[in-house]
Amino acid sequence: FYYRIFHKNRVNAIGYRMHEEYADTFFKHAAEVIKQSENKSAARAYIYGFICHFALDSECHKYVEKMIQVSGITHSEIEMEFDRMMLVQKHIDPMTFHRANCIHPTIKNAAVIAEFYDGVSAKEIRKTLRYMILCDKLLTAQNPIKRKILFFGMKVAGQYEGVHGMVMSEQPNPACKKYCQILNGV
């Protein structure tokens, strides 16, 4: 998703395509990648994170889609409010938390990840990781001036509706409270 995000290309198309495919195809391939990997522990660490993301998407998205239909709140807003709820529970300030702090865009890490995706190089994966960090830094906006500039830029680019929910709102959206409680129970 994050590789040169403003342009459709073969690398970011993989993420979109994978959301439409059956997971067993990827997981069978992943098992082979891990067997053949020179760095099995790093490959397993990546796939464990992938499995967590997959499980969260698989279990929560059906609820999120229903919530969107009922409330009109966007997918990214619901996810952002769910992130807020979990961060607040851990006594972490959601306005300043950088979700990408755990990403280390080394060529070594990128090479491990690239093994899972046919036709994608370690350099492309490293760029993707760097874009993820950049987007996180850009969208983490405690400063009201930065927020106004961000939202203005989104509107000018015609991306406001789809992207504004990725910026943590200053205050919780009360309309999301019950949805977050439902997701927390999933």
What are these regions (language model features)?
Residues 1-186:
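N-terminal leader/auxiliary helical segments
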